[in-house]
Amino acid sequence: MILLKELQIKNFRSHSDSKIEFDTGINLIAGRNGAGKSSILEAILVAFYGLKPATLRKNDLVRVNSSGYSLSLTFSLNGDDYTISRKSNGESILTGKEIVEGDSNITEWVERHLCPAHVFTGAIYVRQGEIDSIIRDDESRERIIRQITRIEDYENAWKNLGAVIRMLEREKERLKEFLSQEEQIKRQKEEKKAEIERISEEIKSIESLREKLSEEVRNLESRLKELEEHKSRLESLRKQESSVLQEVRGLEEKLRELEKQLKEVVERIEDLEKKAKEVKELKPKAERYSILEKLLSEINQALRDVEKREGDLTREAAGIQAQLKKAEEDNSKLEEITKRIEELERELERFEKSHRLLETLKPKMDRMQGIKAKLEEKNLTPDKVEKMYDLLSKAKEEEKEITEKLKKLIAKKSSLKTRGAQLKKAVEELKSAERTCPVCGRELDEEHRKNIMAEYTREMKRIAEELAKADEIEKKLKERLEKVEKALEKQETVLKYRQMVDELKALENELSSHDAEKLSAESEEYRKVKERLDGLRGQQKILLSSASRIKELKSSLREIEEALKNVESERGELHRKIREEGFESLEELEREVQSLRPFYNKWLELKDAESRLESELKRREKLEDEISEAIAKLEEANGKAEEIRGQIDELLRIYSEEEHRRLSDEHLRKSKELAGLKSRLETLRESLQSAEKDLKFLEEQLAKMDEYRKKVEVFEKIAIPELTRIREKFRKYRNLVAENSMREVERYASQIFEELTEGKYSGVRLKKTTERGKEKLKVFVVYQGEEREIGFLSGGEIIALGLAFRLALSMFMIRGKIPLLILDEPTPFLDEERRRKLVDITTNYLRKIPQVIIVSHDEELKDAADKVIFVESQGGVSRVRYVEAQ
């Protein structure tokens, strides 16, 4: 026995995060259309069996803007609790008494321990619109009954056996065709033996020829190896000879260059010896020039410094004298200005208090004037602003009132449109219906069709009129709302001006206790006196600074006069130094330096002759050593060249280039011939291997002939006749099972329907009839001992019969017990009276089932429910809450 306990749904269909708890008895899932009720039943189906029986794609189930769904279903099976958790990414697990992982493994476990998927969807879970489809639709009824009674399994077995028999017949014919080729295969075997013998003889002949040719090639290779060694040795000696001769030429060139350099060095030594002698003669005059030139340079620099300092001091003294005169004049003006400052300070003190007060009030006065200017700019007064604020408050109230009316009106229109759509759909179905009324389920005739269509047309007209009135009211409300919203657009501006008026009143009240005109006049007088006083103080500061420097300037002037005396003393000291060197004047010293300069320059030109002479002497010694070394190397290289020439002549007596070329050509020709023989041998061996393989295959085929003859005999005498007999038994047993299954379903349905209709109908019959050459399974009810077609039943009775059949199929599959029943919208197109009657009929019977789950938006079913689960849509998301059962 199975009982569902709890279902947790995340991001599945319209459910974001829902938790549903189920109890025993009747669980009603209620709510408006589109709220997400049926999604709960789909979640149960997917949790048990995965996506396949739901005939849905994963992407259709995942909630918008989420990455994937997850489901968790807790249930009790034979007293043990289990939980199945499935995710859209394939992560699935069953926990409880057993632990099972993986989508397919869990589905297999459910089908083994609970029931197969087709049983669940055919009997336990009746989807929306299918409760009476088994009664109204002949094809649907026969398909469901064939699935649940497993008649299709026997038909499939009968068809599959036919396919097996045909396959054996084809295999038998194939084997016979093969046996007919026995003589041809024997002939092919003898031909292959002859081919193998011929190829073997040719291989022996070619192998003998190849061995002889291989020996000749080996001898040629040995002689060619000797010649290659001689050739290689000869080429090596010639390279050595070329290298040595090149070395000889290089040494001869080097020797000539060294002798040339030695000659040039000897000539430079002779010239430098003459210059060294001249340097010794010029040295005393050069030294005298250096001493006097240094003295002259120092005295000239000192005289320039003295003259510069003398000029700077003279200019500085003139400047100080001018400043001293100005300071003495400023000192006489200072007393007069100080007296004037004292007078203005007393006058400033009289106006200071008024000025300070005005400075405090000035920002507020400016703000008040600014507010007045802004209001005048907009042609506003405080009274006008107050009136605007009152109008704004009224507009807010009116907006709230209109918005509330629009909400109620839109809700009413939505309800009218929904009812109109239902009526339109019902009218369309009435137009196309043939025998049964889709509204009440009764037999349909033209008068009944016209009456219902007229009633529905009148109601649709009334709904259209109400919708038109509602549209007109909505239009007027929206026009009023638009005007109010335009008025409210100025809300921020009105509030801003009202705040400015409040501020203006506060400022006027605060400033009314002060004489602003008097304060302004006294403040202006204060500003003027302050301006004159600041000017005099600036002058006083400048004069005071100037007068305070008189003493300092006189002291600086005395210091400059002393410095000028020192400068004159330094000039006399410089002239004394000139006389000490034996010159009467600076000009005489300059003439002496000028006369010695040519001797000094000549000495500078020749002074490094001695060091250069020493360097050239060392260079001469080095060149003489290098020449001796080059002569020795040249003699050695000439000897080596003679030795190599002798070895080359000796090698040419035993090596012939002509013989080498001739033997190489012969070796190439015979190598190609040998390669051709090897290639031919490989081809022959491959042909031999292929022929031997073909021979083996032919021998194997001949060996199979007896086995295939036995197989053909088994097929003809045993397998095919026996399978044909078994297939015929399946055909007979299929008909027997079909008859027994239908009688059992018929018995269960009769019991349930009789109880649902409180004995009005005493039975249900299933009969096969033929219409237009096609066999159909039709349903009849027994009323007062007579069989009647289902057109005799009312709409509620049709639903009851459909429910009886669904329950009968469930009992057939699970041995007479119904632990669980799930119904999705069992009352489509029934009016209030018929729905109430169906509730009355079915409630007592459904209470015999341990657990029933019904999805419906009909209020009448709440009376029959033990638990009411209410589903509503909020912002496109399904929300679940529980309502107390009535």
Curated annotation (Swiss-Prot):
Alphabetized GO MF terms: ATP binding; ATP hydrolysis activity; zinc ion binding
Q: Could you tell me which InterPro entries the record lists for this protein?
A: P-loop_NTPase, Rad50/SbcC_AAA, Rad50_ATPase_archaeal, Zn_hook_RAD50
For whether the record's keyword set contains Transferase, the answer is no
UniProt keywords (A-Z) are: ATP-binding, Coiled coil, DNA damage, DNA repair, Hydrolase, Metal-binding, Nucleotide-binding, Zinc
For activity, the cofactor(s) needed are:
Zn(2+)
Cofactor binding mode, per the note?
Binds 1 zinc ion per homodimer.
Q: Which PROSITE patterns match?
A: ZN_HOOK
Q: Report the record's Gene Ontology biological process terms.
A: double-strand break repair
Domain (Zinc-hook): give its ranges.
392-489
Question: What is the residue range of the signal peptide feature?
Answer: none
Coiled-coil region list = 183-360, 400-433, 489-518, 545-713
The record's subunit annotation is: Homodimer. Forms a heterotetramer composed of two Mre11 subunits and two Rad50 subunits.
Pfam families attached here? AAA_23 (PF13476), Rad50_zn_hook (PF04423)
Q: Where does ATP bind?
A: 13, 33-39, 128, 792-797
| Source organism (scientific name) | Archaeoglobus fulgidus (strain ATCC 49558 / DSM 4304 / JCM 9628 / NBRC 100126 / VC-16)
Q: What is this protein called?
A: DNA double-strand break repair Rad50 ATPase
> What is the UniProt domain comment for this protein?
The two conserved Cys that bind zinc constitute the zinc-hook, which separates the large intramolecular coiled coil regions. The 2 Cys residues coordinate one molecule of zinc with the help of the 2 Cys residues of the zinc-hook of another Rad50 molecule, thereby forming a V-shaped homodimer.
Q: Which family does it belong to?
A: Belongs to the SMC family. RAD50 subfamily.
State its role.
Part of the Rad50/Mre11 complex, which is involved in the early steps of DNA double-strand break (DSB) repair. The complex may facilitate opening of the processed DNA ends to aid in the recruitment of HerA and NurA. Rad50 controls the balance between DNA end bridging and DNA resection via ATP-dependent structural rearrangements of the Rad50/Mre11 complex.
- PANTHER family annotated for this entry? ABC TRANSPORTER ABCH.3
List residues binding Zn(2+). Answer: C437, C440
